[in-house]
């Protein structure tokens, strides 16, 4: 083969991510060189040309190697970025975990480069036997040419191939060094971020613990700020203060729950562990703050309910209190309202009673019998009544008090002893009343022990230091009705109250009720045939140091007064008493109202008994009751309720007046009546009904 027939190989730079191939390759132009030409003895004729070709190819190879080395770091890190992108890692790591994921990519690439390097180094070596081969290659090549006297082509291709391997190994080693440094830098950065995260987490935890220890203080401070932002109340009542405080706490809870919802969203979308921990701690603190506020709200609600109950009880007490001055005069008073005005003045009423007693005494002296002498008429002012009220005297609960001695109370009777024994004292005269049309007539009636009982119960009044009043409590004869309270306002504190050492309570004067008027009438005796229905009356004794003489009190409660049933009730179907535990209660069935309407009952107890007897005898309604309840109902008792609807000892259905009797509601108006369970009855009254 002629020298001029030689074709040099080509340089190929291959960018491979650890595939085991050379980064720089030399590809010979031919794989066989044939039979070299005859070389005569003497110096080799190929040395000069061979060296020229070597230097030419070596220059190209060195330049390629130099270019790769110059941009090697950028290219290597670019490989890392490409691998991160393929793995779905963020372009810029912000957390220690992200950095460690990036480090794993770097370490994997470094391992791949090391495998490629090992693949090069494990190939059968011809000339490439030492790391300094690139420096020795030219001299080795020249020596081979001089020694062999062969054609240079084969030697040249072998040297170029080995140099390409050496340069590839150098590139891999440089990349491995770059990746190793990068890996270490990432490790250091990850550790730094982890240390910073631990420090930040410790700060967050310390802040959380401090805030948790001061939840109550923070909650109170926020409530104070919210309260200060509102218009200030001037001399607020406890009820106003409770209302304001309840509003503040309720709003604070609503605000905290909004924050709670937003914070829960942060937990779900937290960008890193630290932010998630912050949100988790905030969630716990919000739970504590809401619990603190709820505890406050519970206390406020409990106090509000307590005060409402006190006010309700006070209202019930006031509505059932007969207030009178203890000045020895004759007075009439309406329950919960005040003194009933006397048309011609209080003195005229006292004189009318005295005249009636005198007339009755004269009549009895000449012809002993049951006689009554009217002394006053009670009329009800319709202008003060609402449309739903019964505009008759029957709706007025009143009491009349007078000196018991005028009705014949013996001065020698030990009232205290009689009262302790729950005893009675016989009186020759008592007071009574009778409704006649729009007027109620008050009379003095003689007693005979048969038609008119002589015995009058005795009670002792007790001084209430809190109110400054003398009081007597009269239990109601109806289970669901509150007791009656009789009070007397003394002219001065009792003798054992020392004004010099204590400040006596000054009770308020008894107000005047303008809804009714007492008009004295001329004393006219009348004979009473049969049995007279008497209202409740008592003889009230007072402590010796009170200076108050015994008082006879006649009081009238509409429940204890005869009356006719009115109203139509309502049609009912299905489980009638199923509504007794809900809402207003179960209405009076219209078929029962039809049976009772127009009938006269001697008192409320009589009406109740007749009502339940009528229900028990109704062919449809009676099917809703068990044999035990039916047996009780046929005797005039109310049916039993299930245990969950009972209240203490109250275990039977009760009848409730929707419009209170004290407010003018009809006692026997069946449109004003509903059947309720004891539990529901209590709930209705707690609601102020």
Swiss-Prot record:
Its EC number is 3.1.-.-. Belongs to the colicin/pyosin nuclease family. It is an enzyme of class 3 (hydrolase). Causes breakdown of chromosomal DNA as well as complete inhibition of lipid synthesis in sensitive cells. This is Pyocin-S2. CDD domains: HNHc (cd00085). SMART domains: HNHc (SM00507). Pfam families: Col-Pyo_DNase (PF21431), Pyocin_S (PF06958). InterPro entries: Colicin/pyocin_DNase_dom_sf (IPR037146), His-Me_finger_sf (IPR044925), HNH_nuc (IPR003615), Pyocin_killer (IPR003060), Pyosin/cloacin_T_dom (IPR016128), Pyosin/cloacin_T_dom_sf (IPR036302).
